[in-house]
A protein has these predicted regions:
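Peptidoglycan glycan-strand catalytic modules in the bacterial/periplasmic cell-wall system
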Residues: 1, 27-116, 198-202, 346, ...
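Aromatic-capped interface at the extracytoplasmic side
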Residues: 1-13, 197
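Conserved, well-ordered alpha-helix/loop/beta-strand core segments that scaffold catalytic motifs
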Residues: 189-233
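Short extracytoplasmic
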Residues: 9-36
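Solvent-exposed, polar/charged alpha-helical surfaces in well-ordered, non-transmembrane soluble domains
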Residues: 71, 75, 79, 109, ...
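Beta-lactam-recognizing serine transpeptidase/beta-lactamase-like catalytic domain environment
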Residues: 32, 183-194, 239-280, 285-516, ...
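Short, small/polar residue-rich loop motifs at catalytic or cofactor-binding pockets
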Residues: 10, 15-18, 229-233, 419
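Small/polar-residue-rich segments within soluble enzyme cores
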Residues: 72-80, 88-201, 512, 529
Length: 560
């Protein structure tokens, strides 16, 4: 019994911390990494005897030295770690559950190795004992604010507390190990009972993000918000051929290295967390459903009156006009609410809802980032006036990521790819790790995709100053009334611009959304410059061949 209690008394166990997985962009630029550091801890029982074995009777000189040890050790810790000696007295005199001096008391996390070497040097020079260290790496974000709303951050304990760091914390964290051994106040007992369970490092991820494009997107977004005197905004850039997200920018933003200084509105990933009425960009989805059903072609005719009765109210267009005779192409180019609603009335409500669902609206994209909103779409039993509203982008809500992924699936030949942020992963042993599979489904025909691209190209080719050099581009503007969550009424605007290129074989999509602009409010004025700038950089960056044909200009009106 005595031997057992002595063994328990001298048993010493501490955790071995794994290295957290690294995050890099698609080109290997480090977004989040772990740097070597140590956890400083003390053995209060060892300090109380200043290293003299408990089985040895101390001399008077040793007793005097031991009595001074807690104060001396606290002073060394304060000198090297900052603060006052009193701040460390609790740690160096800590007791266990039985009220006895503890064998293990944490002093400070994330201390750099150089500082701990200075502590060891001071302890040795003074002839003091009882301060130790174990692996306790520091999480750093070399890119700072770049993609911080996506990458996220860790808390003081090193656990993911925001963004990808939070949603993939378990995989990134790895599995702690532990080491147990028998020790006296002099240290390990050489032939004692020793066990070692090694830590397993966390999984490292290569993201689909392009850090340089992400930086440009954040800069372009910041400029757009400043010029529009807006509250906030977001940009998402995608490769339409596979659903990979190349940039995901939110403003205002923060520095992942300093999450404690960030406000809640700065840490939001607006691209996935903010749901809003998309406005006229939604007309692309409406036209896609109509063309896929064979109800219209780009040349279909529609008589557009100056106003349209709907549910006891009237639908009007942004610019007042008399009776117009537009093609479907002209309806999209002029962004006619009336023309879109009239066409949509030829579409069965249940069919409309099935297309909205196929396009990925009304449900999270499951991109693997926290706080993703679902948005809302109406039921097939919606009243007629709701169908009118939904056709031109009111009466439903989406996230920027949902809307971007939907348009990507329309223009790429008609195949929806669930958006993804993960390119590849490697586990703690250096072996490839399985990543979530993206879902793909055909949503419209190849023919319908070509017809929608025809209409979107004319939005650009018939406007002044909007094309990008060397590439044919398709686009759609959006200007939606903003629903104020406080009064549940319309207040202010959400202005947007979505662009895809090259239109003959789309590769890159850019969607810019500006919230509550006060200096201009149309998507063309507020959001288009940022989209144009980013597209002109991204296309050559990804080796996309310039267009060989000139942009087409097709009839927007017809003679009755």
């Amino acid at each position: 019994a005595y031997a057992a209690s002595a063994a328990a008394r001298m048993k010493y166990t501490y955790a071995l911390q794994p290295n957290r997985g690294e995050l890099t962009d698609r080109n290997g630029i480090v977004m989040a990494q772990t740097q070597p550091a140590v956890l400083v801890f003390v053995d209060p029982r060892m300090i109380s005897r200043n290293g003299v074995d408990e089985r040895v009777t101390m001399t008077r000189e040793q007793q005097e030295k031991a009595a001074a040890a807690p104060k001396a050790v606290a002073k060394i810790l304060a000198t090297r770690l900052g603060g006052q000696p009193e701040d460390y007295r609790k740690a160096v005199t800590a007791t266990d559950a039985k009220g006895k001096l503890s064998r293990y008391s944490v002093v400070r996390h994330h201390v750099d190795s150089y500082t701990f070497d200075l502590i060891k040097k001071d302890m040795k020079q003074g002839g003091w004992y009882g301060v130790f260290s174990s692996n306790d790496p520091i999480r750093t974000y070399p890119s700072g604010q770049v993609a911080s709303n996506v990458v996220g951050f860790v808390n003081a304990e090193g656990k993911g507390a925001g963004g990808f760091e939070y949603s993939h914390n378990k995989q990134l964290a790895g599995v702690p190990g532990k080491e147990s051994y028998e020790a006296s106040t002099w240290g390990r007992i050489p032939l004692g009972s020793n066990t070692l369970v090694p830590a397993v490092d966390g999984t490292s991820y290569t993201l689909t993000l392009d850090a340089q494009l992400q930086l440009m997107a954040q800069q372009a977004l910041g400029t757009a918000i400043k010029n529009a005197k807006a509250k906030s905004g977001e940009i998402v850039m995608m490769d339409v051929t596979n659903g990979e997200v190349l940039a995901m920018a939110s403003m205002p933003t923060f520095d992942s290295n300093k999450p404690g200084k960030a406000k809640e509105n700065q840490t939001r990933n607006r691209v996935i967390q903010d749901a809003y009425e998309p406005g006229s960009v939604q007309k692309v989805l409406t036209m896609a459903a109509l063309t896929d059903q064979g109800i219209i072609t780009p040349d279909s005719h529609i008589v557009v009156p100056r106003a349209l009765s709907s549910g006891g109210g009237k639908i009007t267009d942004a610019e007042p006009h008399g009776t117009e005779y537009l093609t479907a192409r002209g309806v999209l180019v002029h962004s006619s609410n009336i023309g879109t609603a009239l066409f949509a009335r030829k579409l069965d409500k249940a069919t409309m809802v099935s297309y909205l669902k196929a396009f990925g609206l009304g449900a999270p994209t499951r991109i693997g980032l926290p706080g993703e909103a679902s948005g809302q779409i109406p039921k097939p039993t919606m009243p007629d006036y709701t169908r009118d509203q939904v056709a031109f982008g009111q009466g439903l809500s989406v996230t920027a990521l949902q809307e971007a992924a939907a348009v990507a699936g329309i223009v790429n030949g008609g195949v929806y790819h669930s958006p993804t942020i993960i390119k590849s992963a490697v586990d703690g042993h250096g072996e490839p790790s399985e990543i979530p599979k993206t879902t793909t489904r055909r949503v419209i025909s190849q023919r319908a995709s070509e017809e929608v691209r025809d209409m979107m190209e004319n939005v650009v080719s018939t406007a002044k100053g909007r094309p990008i050099p060397d590439y044919r581009m398709g686009a759609k503007t959006g200007t939606a009334q903003r629903i104020d969550p406080e009064c549940h009424c319309y207040h202010g605007y959400i202005s947007s611009f979505i662009a895809v290129a090259p239109i003959e074989k789309p590769r890159i999509l850019t969607y810019v959304v500006i919230n509550q602009p006060t200096n201009g409010h149309t998507g063309t004025a507020v959001a288009q410059p940022a989209a144009r700038q980013l597209m002109s950089v991204a296309l050559p960056r990804y080796g996309v061949q310039p267009s060989t044909d000139k942009a087409r200009k097709e009839p927007l009106e017809y003679q009755p």
